C-alpha cells in the first residue's frame, strides 16, 4: 500500500480535540492498513515519533429513507499517541 493511501483525513470532533493536549490524534485510515503501516506513514509524513497506534473498525450501518434502504459505508479509525515531547503543529492551530 502506498504512503498516500493509508491516512485519509483527521477526525475533527470535540472528543478528538480533547486528546490533543495529551498528544493523542485521531485519523480515518484505509480499511486494509495495519498498525505498522499507519505508524510508518504517520512518522514519514509529519516527521514525529509515534508511541502507539490503536485502531477501531466500524461496520456499515443500515439507513432507511421511507421504503428505501441504503447503507452508510464502513470505515477504520486510528488513534495515534505521540512520544513525550513530540508535537503535531498541523492540527494544533485549529
Swiss-Prot record:
Pfam families listed in its UniProt record: Ribosomal_L23
InterPro entries referenced in this protein's UniProt entry, alphabetically: Nucleotide-bd_a/b_plait_sf (IPR012677), Ribosomal_uL23-like (IPR013025), Ribosomal_uL23/eL15/eS24_sf (IPR012678), Ribosomal_uL23_CS (IPR001014)
A single GO cellular-component term on record: ribonucleoprotein complex
A GO BP annotation: translation
GO MF annotation list: rRNA binding; structural constituent of ribosome
Top-level division of the source organism's lineage: Bacteria
Keywords: Ribonucleoprotein, Ribosomal protein, RNA-binding, rRNA-binding
Assembly with partners or alone: Part of the 50S ribosomal subunit. Contacts protein L29, and trigger factor when it is bound to the ribosome.
Function description: One of the early assembly proteins it binds 23S rRNA. One of the proteins that surrounds the polypeptide exit tunnel on the outside of the ribosome. Forms the main docking site for trigger factor binding to the ribosome.
Family: Belongs to the universal ribosomal protein uL23 family.
HAMAP family linked to this entry: Ribosomal_uL23_B
NCBIfam families per UniProt: PRK05738.2-4
Protein's name according to its UniProt entry: Large ribosomal subunit protein uL23
Amino acid at each position: 500500500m502506498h504512503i498516500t493511501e493509508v491516512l485519509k483525513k483527521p477526525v475533527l470532533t470535540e472528543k478528538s480535540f480533547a486528546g490533543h493536549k495529551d498528544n493523542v490524534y485521531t485519523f480515518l485510515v484505509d480499511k486494509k492498513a495495519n498498525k505498522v503501516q499507519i505508524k510508518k506513514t504517520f512518522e514519514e509524513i509529519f516527521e514525529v515519533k509515534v508511541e502507539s497506534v490503536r485502531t477501531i473498525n466500524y461496520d456499515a450501518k443500515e439507513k432507511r429513507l421511507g421504503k428505501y434502504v441504503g447503507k452508510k459505508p464502513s470505515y477504520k479509525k486510528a488513534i495515534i499517541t505521540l512520544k513525550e515531547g513530540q508535537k503535531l503543529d498541523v492540527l494544533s492551530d485549529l
